[in-house]
């Protein structure tokens, strides 16, 4: 998180946190604290603002009501005055040197530590001038030499001779480009101290600040404090430093030398138990012993992955060892420790699963607010998660495979707002100067500004149901879902309640995602849903959705936005398809086989780790496969896939069949006139919907259709399929643009109605006129046999009125429109010879 003080970049807008807030993102927890400051990126809406800690970090969202926008003047850090040290607070420290190694150190902002200036000095701590800001033009190959001498001079601090000194010729770039605090890039630091101690012997001990507990001494291979005890001097019960009051040097606190085989080995460190059963750690190379788990060094190549291309310089083994050490408690920084995966169990507790042994541990907090871990079976409890001996190569493979799996399963990640690589534990009260370095375990920083998450384009509450999933029909189940259009993907999650946007809600993971690439969108027919304002979305993967809203304006807006998004995706895909799509239909089969091979290969790779070369090869093949694969519309335009009969445009269908009346319409009419004119309730009685769907499927797939087959012996199945054909037309037989004209015509005087309707029919396209003529002549013959089938002009008009004539957008006048629709059909049937001639 951001610091509460530090240098401010000129010309930028900043916000300051007024209240604490936290929420769960996809794979981490976003936490902001009162007083923290961030760089304002964008005021997304009234509820959420987009911010980031610095210009090089990933942006994330904060609630606008919890922050305030501040000016540069308000953000400038105050000038701190040096405070005198009391006589009894600190003994004379002869010399204290903070010396930077003269070796050439690589500049790595991701591995920087926070320099955390103390707000006040109350007799303890090392004093630092708040105005001591270093320039940004330091050479990373030069040496920083800081000398800080604190003398016990009558209780006063000698600022003239003992203030920090920085050589103008030996400076190093210490601070990253962050808008908040300054960042001290300390990769290898050693403290040397000469002072009085309790013990009379001579020797050296290694101590380390422990931010979690002050009751035990700990040592680390990355930060070492050496305390030399001169003879004939003593300081009973006095702290080593004034700001390290809890740490005391005690020769007897060291663990014993190992006398039995190691319980566990991790690199150079071995885990042993003493006679009381307490675990301690022993380094075979340096012979260090410590009660606290050491910080493991990260692999050189892994550390370099976090550098930008322009900053990659070779590190010496020692420098890399010291600059790449991490605390095991990585989960406190927002991500689980390396080698562990994090999830929530059914009770909402944080559950960690080992990537090596599949062992499960739970995280808990004791009554003092300290975090600890216990195994799922309750047999063990530790302050830190167990560490397992895994080679750096295996760790990289697990990291890479996990990252690949996540991208494949969840193509759009909305809540992963930032790639935070450095987190300062601001709640660490025991050790104000302790810093923690946290790097993401399964991702690398973006190499350019182009890799930003796409912005939110549209969101809102919609009713949605799936009718087909992966080519298989599913039961319709309408749900009220929160929809978010993000780039080329449409995401659905549960209702957000009072939240007005996707961001910041606890429901950060979408229920399902729809890929709009190659999708088809159209208004749904009545047989798909009886609801109003429904449109159908068909994806390239074989999923069909019905999306609905009671608000006409909302559904029309969504329809336009989704149509525009789909058209943009089709245009981009067609450009690639024109260059690389094969011209021969025979290659389509080869492409399908190749697709299946690629998918099988992809599934096998998900379960196993891959080395770097294999992963690069797979990414390249997958990218090539996705870019070369043509969209459904492009293949259909080339003639490889024929359009279906049901749901096709009438003019296109007639053009494809080289006629003006669809063949299926002729076939149904001939069959009904031959076998069904005397059937009671013909066209009014509904047929078996399942059999009708089978007939529809057979027609759409160009199967040889014989209506005299026993499968179609029910005449109501034939009439039901004919009515379904006209219902599923994208534009009804009486086209949308003439609907109001037909309604106005039927409102005229009886003598003028026929002429007006006749003139309007002549304005329709030729396929519409011819199909209308053959259909109405057939219905006239059905009515003429009314003594047998009991069908009248009114009953036929009621059946076919809403099917053949309907407005483009349903309004509140459905009942009135239904009356007009029936009257128009009835008028044409009564005046058939006048309208169409004999």
UniProtKB/Swiss-Prot annotation:
GO terms for cellular component: phagocytic cup. Residues 10-72 form the SH3 domain. This is Rho GTPase-activating protein 12. Keywords: GTPase activation, Phosphoprotein, Repeat, SH3 domain. The gene is Arhgap12. The modification Phosphotyrosine is found at residue 241. Residues 155-172, 189-198, 303-334 have a biased composition (Polar residues). It holds the Pfam family WW. Coiled coil: none annotated. One of its GO terms (molecular function) is GTPase activator activity. Residues 648-836 form the Rho-GAP domain. The keyword Acetylation does not apply.
């Amino acid at each position: 998180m951001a610091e509460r003080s530090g240098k401010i970049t000129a010309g930028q807008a900043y916000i300051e946190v007024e209240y604490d807030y936290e929420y769960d993102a996809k794979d981490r927890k976003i936490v902001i604290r009162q007083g923290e400051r961030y760089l304002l990126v964008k005021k997304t809406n009234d509820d959420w603002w987009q911010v980031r800690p610095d210009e090089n970090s990933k942006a994330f969202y904060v609630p606008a009501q919890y922050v305030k926008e501040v000016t540069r003047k308000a953000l400038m850090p105050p000038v701190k005055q040096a405070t005198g040290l009391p006589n009894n607070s600190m003994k004379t420290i002869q010399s204290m040197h903070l010396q930077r190694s003269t070796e050439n150190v690589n500049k790595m902002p991701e591995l920087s530590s926070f320099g955390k200036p103390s707000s006040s000095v109350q007799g303890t701590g090392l004093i630092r001038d708040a105005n001591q800001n270093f320039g940004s033009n330091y050479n990373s190959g030069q040496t920083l030499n800081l000398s800080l001498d604190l003398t016990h001079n009558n209780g006063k601090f000698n600022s003239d001779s003992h203030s920090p000194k920085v050589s103008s010729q030996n400076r190093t770039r210490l601070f990253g480009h962050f808008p908040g605090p300054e960042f001290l890039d300390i990769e290898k630091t050693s403290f040397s101290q000469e002072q009085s101690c309790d013990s009379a012997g001579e020797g050296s001990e290694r101590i380390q600040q422990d931010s979690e507990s002050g009751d035990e001494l700990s040592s680390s291979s990355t930060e070492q404090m050496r305390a030399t005890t001169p003879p004939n001097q003593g300081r009973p019960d006095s702290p080593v430093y004034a700001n390290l009051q809890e740490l005391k040097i005690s020769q007897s606190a060291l663990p014993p030398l190992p006398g039995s085989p190691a319980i566990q080995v991790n690199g150079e460190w071995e885990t042993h138990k003493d006679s009381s059963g307490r675990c301690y750690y022993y380094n075979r190379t340096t012979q260090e012993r410590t009660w606290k788990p050491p910080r493991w060094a990260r692999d050189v190549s892994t550390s370099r992955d976090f550098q930008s291309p322009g900053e990659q310089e070779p590190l010496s083994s020692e420098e890399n060892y010291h600059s790449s050490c991490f605390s095991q408690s990585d989960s406190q920084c927002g991500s689980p420790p390396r080698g562990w995966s994090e999830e929530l169990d059914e009770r909402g507790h944080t559950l960690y699963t080992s990537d090596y042994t599949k062992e499960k541990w739970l995280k808990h907090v004791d009554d003092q607010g300290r975090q600890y871990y216990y195994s799922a079976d309750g047999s063990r409890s530790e302050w830190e998660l167990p560490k397992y001996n895994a080679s750096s190569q295996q760790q990289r493979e697990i990291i890479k495979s996990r990252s690949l799996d996540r991208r494949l399963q969840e193509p759009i990640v909305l809540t992963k707002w930032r790639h935070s690589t450095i987190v300062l534990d601001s709640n660490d009260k025991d050790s104000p100067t302790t810093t923690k370095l946290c790097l993401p375990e399964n991702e690398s920083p973006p190499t350019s500004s182009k890799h930003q998450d796409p912005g939110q384009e549209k969101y809102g509450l919609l009713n949605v149901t799936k009718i087909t999933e992966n080519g298989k029909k599913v039961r319709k189940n309408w749900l009220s879902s929160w929809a978010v259009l993000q780039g080329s993907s449409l995401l659905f999650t549960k209702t957000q309640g009072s939240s007005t946007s996707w961001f910041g809600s606890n429901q950060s993971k979408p229920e399902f995602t729809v890929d709009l690439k190659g999708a088809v969108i159209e208004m749904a027919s009545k047989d798909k849903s009886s609801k109003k304002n429904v449109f159908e979305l068909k994806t390239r993967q074989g999923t069909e959705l019905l999306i609905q809203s009671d608000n006409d304006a909302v559904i029309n807006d969504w329809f336009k936005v989704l149509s525009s998004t789909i058209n943009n995706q089709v245009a981009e895909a067609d450009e690639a398809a024109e260059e690389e799509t094969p011209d021969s239909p025979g290659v389509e089969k080869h492409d399908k086989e190749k697709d299946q091979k690629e998918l099988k290969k992809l599934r096998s790779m998900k379960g196993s780790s891959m080395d770097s070369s294999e992963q690069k090869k797979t990414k390249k093949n997958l990218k090539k496969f996705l870019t070369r694969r043509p969209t459904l519309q492009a293949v259909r335009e080339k003639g490889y896939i024929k359009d279906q009969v049901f749901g096709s445009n009438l003019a296109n269908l007639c053009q494809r069949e080289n006629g003006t009346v669809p063949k299926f319409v002729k076939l149904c009419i001939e069959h009904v006139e031959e076998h069904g004119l005397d059937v009671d309730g013909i066209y009014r009685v509904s047929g078996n919907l399942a059999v009708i769907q089978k007939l529809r499927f057979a027609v759409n797939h160009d199967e040889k259709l014989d209506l005299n087959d026993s499968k179609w012996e029910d005449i109501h199945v034939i009439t039901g399929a004919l009515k379904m054909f006209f219902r599923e037309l994208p534009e009804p037989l009486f086209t949308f643009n003439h609907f109001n004209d037909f309604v106005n015509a039927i409102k005229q005087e009886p003598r003028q109605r026929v002429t007006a309707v006749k003139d309007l029919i002549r304005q329709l396209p030729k396929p519409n006129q011819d199909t209308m003529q053959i259909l109405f002549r057939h219905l006239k013959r059905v009515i003429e046999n009314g003594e047998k089938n009991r069908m009248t002009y009114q009953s036929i008009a009621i059946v076919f009125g809403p099917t053949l004539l309907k407005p483009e957008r349903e309004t509140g006048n459905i009942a009135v429109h239904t009356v007009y629709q029936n009257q128009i059909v009835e008028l044409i049937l009564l005046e058939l010879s006048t309208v169409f001639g004999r």
